[in-house]
């Protein structure tokens, strides 16, 4: 029967590594419970707690909280647990009831973002989602180094979750999804599934004050959002020293061009610089700037030199732009082809951009030279509720058709072009 189990389980992936190749402190087992109880510790073998004298000498220097087994003991227990798991899957009467495996990782958490019940042939265990503390370190590696200090210091704020030890021992570290079902080898990237912002974002947000810090976001914060945060964070606290420094820099820029007559205006600009910096992007600009550009584009004040904040303000403020769909006639003189098609008319400030179309024969690009609105020819409205007229083909004169009301009565309508095509 053992040979049969080995043949069937050849398809599974079993890496050649010791069962505890990472830091995974296990709680001490209850005396009244055995291996089949609620503990992960095995009798005589398996992962022993770090406080036991047997595992103290076998623990590695890099992994002080984990014991190691010899090759013979590991192979014997591993093969026996594999066979028992196979017998439990085939039929309940073929062998004894399966116990928990001697390896430290015997299950796969399907979705690391939500609470999920781990399905495993060796048993069922629920891993609760760990709520992230704002005071705790940002990554699971930092939490593993500090031990269970954050959990033991705040027992009243958060109760014990399911799957956590009840005797106050340090909680086992939560790992992302493993490579295989029975594989103790976890992914190398421990920060693959982090709740809240990453370590880089946590270091950036630690410098901000408590009043500016909001609730942690539900999704992961990417590197681009971190860069945006670094750009926005230093601009909030603006002091008079920063305004004076900016005024001095602006004076050094404008002094060669405008001459020595600028100190009064530079002082005014130095006072106005912190106000413009403290103004949020959603607030409307001042009245002086509003009357400068009527078409929505920011017009520079006459005689004013370049400002260090002008490119940032230009990027933050959206320009006046809209897209309007039109119908136009396209005509290729080389191929003597004329067609009607919809195009997009982009208006940005005072610039009108036509999106070109290509001739189907010579592949040349053309702009529409006749513009008409998308209106119904019957009710003269852009959005109409007129009944759609289906095409009716006369058997005697197939080139005369009743088409849509949009092109009815036009000089070059659908029926005219259809008739012209039949005549040719």
UniProtKB/Swiss-Prot annotation:
A zinc finger (3CxxC-type) spans 326-409. The keyword RNA-binding applies. InterPro entries: Zar1 (IPR026775), ZAR1/RTP1-5-like_Znf-3CxxC (IPR027377). It comes from the Eukaryota. Ovary and testis. SMART domains: zf-3CxxC (SM01328). The keyword Cell division does not apply. GO terms for cellular component: cytoplasm; cytoplasmic ribonucleoprotein granule; intracellular membraneless organelle. It holds the Pfam family Zn_ribbon_3CxxC. mRNA-binding protein that mediates formation of MARDO (mitochondria-associated ribonucleoprotein domain), a membraneless compartment that stores maternal mRNAs in oocytes. MARDO assembly around mitochondria is directed by an increase in mitochondrial membrane potential during oocyte growth. Promotes formation of MARDO phase-separated membraneless compartment by undergoing liquid-liquid phase separation upon binding to maternal mRNAs. Binds to the 3'-UTR of maternal mRNAs. Maternal mRNAs stored in the MARDO are translationally repressed. This is Zygote arrest protein 1. The lineage of its organism: Eukaryota, Metazoa, Chordata, Craniata, Vertebrata.
